[in-house]
Amino acid sequence: MSKRINFNDVQPNAYEAMEALDKFVDETSIDKLYREIIKIRASQINGCAYCVDSHSHDAMRLGASMQKVLLISAWREARNIFSDEERLLLRMTEEITLIHQHGLGEETYQKAIEVFGEGKTAQIIMAIIAINAWNRIGVATELRPPHRRKELAPH
């Protein structure tokens, strides 16, 4: 297996553009933990192990329980673990990430407008688009998560 490119080294302008999109998302009114939940779910769907690892740790640092992080992929079956807003965010994330299936459905979109308003819904859509782009970079360049054995060891 050959070593893949590092975008920051090879195409710094492209990397800077991605960082600018991240800066926009970071400055939105979306709750920080909600942003991490979006990032984890999209990364799971896209198979980006690096991003799943990174954002799972970020979510726990923000106060998410390990149980919540572990159940993100099974959020429908773990409805009692996630708030109504979190379930809506997860549904939006899946529909936008799997855009080739049906896209963001009208029912989901209208519920988002009702719950979050137009401005925040636009911010959420951009947050989902951003992590999907990062996931594609991560998968295409074969980014791998670091070993975190000490961090994950039971206490």
Predicted features and spans:
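Hydrophobic alpha-helical segments
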Residues: M1-H155
